[in-house]
Amino acid sequence: MSTTIDVPESSNVAKGKAVLVAPPRPGGWKKGVAIMDFILRLGAIAAALGAAATMGTSDQTLPFFTQFLQFEASYDSFTSFQFFVITMALVGGYLVLSLPFSFVAIIRPHAAGPRLFLIILDTVFLTLTTASGASAAAIVYLAHNGNQDSNWLAICNQFGDFCAQTSSAVVSSFVAVVVLVLLVVLSALALGKR
């Protein structure tokens, strides 16, 4: 008794092997760009929300005051700082909401739709971030140096903590600007080399 079974071929022509998985499309670097995009978005979220939180909590009251007058410096005393806090919070919110689109770009690196959507909105929010950072930087400069022509005195000699917080918030916003510029450039590279 034999334990092997012989099965003859059904036809005279030998069949070839079929490829079950299509070979990967060229341009695997796009997946690396998409991963870098996701990581940069996380960094921009930290910079934008950190700038908004730092500026939003900047408040200092001097320890001396009179019966009718108390000396206080707060972000809500300056409309440029209010604009800064609102804008940086919006930018941080947008960046959080853009993470799923960035994740789709990782899964489907050759899809142009999510990439085009991100580059348009990244450019809009880059503009907002730059505008709010520049307006806050102008006020921080005046707080540090004053302006003799308009009788604006430098207040950072008295309100050192307030000025340190607002300065660090402005620096953090410009870190977010640099990261957003990198995101726009990465998206443009991924879209351009089709």
UniProtKB/Swiss-Prot annotation:
UniProt KW keywords: Cell membrane, Cell wall biogenesis/degradation, Membrane, Transmembrane, Transmembrane helix
Compartment list: Cell membrane
Top-level division of the source organism's lineage: Eukaryota
Bilayer-spanning residue ranges: 33-53, 83-103, 116-136, 169-189
One of the record's GO cellular component terms: plasma membrane
Cytoplasmic side: 1-32, 104-115, 190-194
Spans within the Extracellular topological domain: 54-82, 137-168
Matching InterPro entries: CASP/CASPL, CASP_dom, CASPL
Membrane-related topology note: Multi-pass membrane protein
Keyword Glycosyltransferase: no
GO BP: cell wall modification; cell-cell junction assembly
NCBIfam families: A_tha_TIGR01569 (TIGR01569)
Family listed: Belongs to the Casparian strip membrane proteins (CASP) family.
Subunit structure: Homodimer and heterodimers.
Annotated function: Regulates membrane-cell wall junctions and localized cell wall deposition. Required for establishment of the Casparian strip membrane domain (CSD) and the subsequent formation of Casparian strips, a cell wall modification of the root endodermis that determines an apoplastic barrier between the intraorganismal apoplasm and the extraorganismal apoplasm and prevents lateral diffusion.
Protein name: Casparian strip membrane protein 2
Lineage per the UniProt record: Eukaryota, Viridiplantae, Streptophyta, Embryophyta, Tracheophyta
